[in-house]
Regions:
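Short acidic loop-to-helix transition motifs that present clustered carboxylates
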Residues: 59-66, 218-221, 279-282
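Conserved beta-strand scaffold positions in the cores of enzyme catalytic domains, especially
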Residues: 55-57, 122-124, 211-213, 242-244, ...
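Structural alpha-beta junctions
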Residues: 52-54, 205-212, 263-272
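C-terminal active-site/capping subdomain that shapes the small-molecule cofactor and substrate pocket
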Residues: 228-314
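Active-site phosphate/pyrophosphate-binding segments
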Residues: 2-5, 11, 22-23, 29-30, ...
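Glycine-rich phosphate-binding loops that contact phosphosugars or nucleotide phosphates
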Residues: 22-166, 177-178, 247-252, 259-267
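Short, small/acidic-rich helices and loops at N termini and domain boundaries
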Residues: 309-325
Length: 325
């Protein structure tokens, strides 16, 4: 259950991934991670944690439109917690047809079978029957193992000790109450875009409510003007409630922009919640925030009387897609 997943989140970083067919895995400096939904969140976070890493996150059919030479210089990592994601299986088949170096991350399903059949390196995640969005720690450890980043794995392992999920529940419950009967809009710096996106999808999937996200400074040049409300447009935006993810490590100019935005929004009658990203390290800071997001989304679901675990609309959509073939 999702409650247990949140409470034991730190234990995911005790995970020691086993790479099967490891003899076929070479060392790469460039990567493409193909995954949908919760299965690409670990790669997103990895980009935020180590911006210098050359990694393309691809959430679509096939592969990114790169030249053949460029693709052959990258390890293509196919990530699907269920192992049955249509787009990721298509990416596997595309990579196989083009004879590209690849590896697989999945808990079970067709993707594992394909990896075994084709002798492709793979990590089979432990199946705790959790939603993919709740297995980001496991996916991160598996991704780092395939990349051969042992130093980063060792740093991530410290989260098993430093993360204290239960300590964040009270804050999450309070934030859910403040955000009740509104649509959260999460803003962060561009370098923390992955954190803002995680907050958004947790509100969507766990909380079962609309939520949106964007980044500074880009939104200062467009989206922000949509909230310069007038009498005739007030009804369109009165349900939005802003969540600013502030990071002391951000560029001082970004910090200034967020402070000015906070004033502008409050002057126009909008509610703004400010969350300061804190932690003993960059990765600790990221996951501290994500656990707070989990608790907030969980208690949001409770306030609305919805199931925080399942995603019935996604499952219904998949069935309809399959029926149309």
């Amino acid at each position: 259950m999702i409650l247990d997943d949140i409470k034991s989140y730190n234990k995911q970083f005790e995970y020691e991934p086993l790479v099967e067919n490891v003899g076929k895995l070479k060392k790469f400096k460039k990567f493409v991670v193909c995954g949908m939904g919760g299965s690409h969140l670990a790669a997103d976070i990895l980009k935020a944690w180590h911006p210098e890493l050359d990694i393309i996150v691809w959430s679509n059919y096939g592969l990114p439109p790169l030249g053949e030479k460029e693709l052959k210089e990258r390890l293509v990592i196919l990530s699907s917690y269920s192992g049955g994601t249509e787009e990721t299986i298509d990416a596997f088949n595309t990579a196989k047809a083009r004879r590209l170096p690849m590896a697989v991350i999945a808990a079970h399903g067709k993707l594992i079978s394909l990896a075994e059949k084709n002798k492709v390196p793979y990590v089979q995640l432990p199946d705790f029957h959790q939603q993919p969005r709740m297995a980001t720690g496991l996916s991160l450890m598996a991704t780092l193992a395939l990349m051969g980043e042992r130093t980063w794995m060792a740093e991530a392992k410290t989260l098993a000790i430093h993360l204290r999920p239960s300590r964040e529940e009270h804050r999450g419950k309070d934030l859910a109450k403040h955000l009740h009967d509104s649509v959260p809009v999460i803003y962060a710096s561009a370098r923390n875009a992955a954190i803002a996106y995680n907050w958004k999808i947790k509100f969507n999937e766990t909380g079962k409510i609309p939520a949106f996200q964007n980044v500074v400074p880009e939104l200062n040049h467009n989206e922000m003007t949509g909230f310069d409300t007038k009498t005739k447009t007030h009804s369109l935006s009165r349900h939005f409630h802003f969540v600013f993810l502030k990071d002391g490590a951000d560029d001082p100019r970004i910090i200034k922009r967020m402070s000015v935005m906070e004033k502008l929004f409050k002057d126009r009658g909008f509610k703004v919640e400010v969350i300061f990203l804190q932690g003993k390290s960059e990765i600790h800071k990221i996951f501290n925030s994500l656990i707070l997001a989990d608790w907030t989304a969980f208690h949001t679901a409770k306030l609305y009387g919805t199931d925080p675990q399942e995603v019935p609309m996604v499952e219904e959509f998949k069935k309809l897609i399959a029926r149309e073939r």
